[in-house]
């Protein structure tokens, strides 16, 4: 990186795109992930240069980025290719609410908008605290969050935390601490035994089929199935560890639990 703050940034995941827009720093963005949909205008304003685990390296290089923002080990191969070409890369790895707030503050500092980032993060913290307090004394339905269906994968830490803030009780909180999806596999019998009152599903961009969930062998007596409380939470709202999850994602969970 030869310019600081970086003037030309490429974001290979959605949450950094939304964060930069919220900070008023969108003019620094010169390329985004093909999955970036927040805010809606990003799809018309910024060229798409990647999927999630693959990227158009020549296109990225042609955009002459000062900095490329990535996420986790899942993009390690992309990161490796870019580093070999001399590109400065920053990989975030937030997996819980505290990490999301830290990412916002850190990215703000990187682009010279530390004050704006602090206000944004503080506003989110206040919002989360207010909702948690409002739900403290309400009955807490047991919630199974399904991130994928075949195999079944339970929710990651930030999702588990948001379920609790929204007034629910995650039935697999011990699994949520695992970063890798392979460590959050659950068996059908595990869910039957947990007997969730509500099932929330967000299948990583694939359309959730509630009838398919309800038809699983042995699930007919699960309270959530019996009472038809199976709800889809759209992936862009909840599976991106950034502003969307703390706002619209959280609100969607609270509506489903009410």
Question: PLM ranges: what are they?
Answer:
Residues 1-258:
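N-terminal ligand-binding lobe of clamshell/alpha-beta domains
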């Amino acid at each position: 990186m030869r310019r600081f703050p970086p003037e030309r940034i490429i974001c290979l995941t959605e949450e950094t795109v939304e964060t930069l827009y919220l900070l008023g720093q969108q003019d620094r963005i010169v390329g985004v992930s093909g999955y970036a949909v927040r805010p809606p205008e990003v799809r018309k304003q910024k060229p798409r240069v990647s999927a999630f685990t693959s990227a158009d390296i020549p296109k990225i290089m042609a955009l002459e980025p000062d900095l490329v923002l990535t996420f986790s080990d899942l993009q390690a191969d992309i990161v490796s290719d870019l580093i070999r070409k001399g590109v400065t890369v920053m990989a975030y790895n937030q997996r819980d609410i505290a990490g999301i707030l830290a990412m916002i503050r850190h990215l703000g500092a990187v682009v010279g908008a530390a004050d704006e980032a602090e206000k944004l993060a503080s506003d989110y913290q206040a919002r989360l605290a207010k909702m948690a307090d409002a739900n403290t004394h309400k009955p807490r339905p047991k919630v199974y969050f399904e991130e994928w269906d075949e195999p079944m994968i339970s929710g990651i830490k930030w999702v588990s935390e948001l379920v609790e803030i929204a007034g629910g009780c995650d039935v697999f909180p011990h699994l949520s601490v695992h970063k890798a999806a392979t460590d959050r596999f659950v068996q059908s019998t595990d869910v039957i035994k947990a007997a969730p009152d509500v099932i929330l599903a967000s299948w990583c961009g694939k359309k959730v089929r509630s009838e398919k969930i309800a038809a699983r062998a042995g699930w007919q007596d699960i309270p959530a199935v019996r009472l038809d409380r199976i709800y889809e939470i759209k992936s862009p709202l909840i599976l991106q560890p950034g502003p969307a999850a703390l706002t619209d994602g959280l609100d969607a969970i609270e509506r489903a639990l009410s």
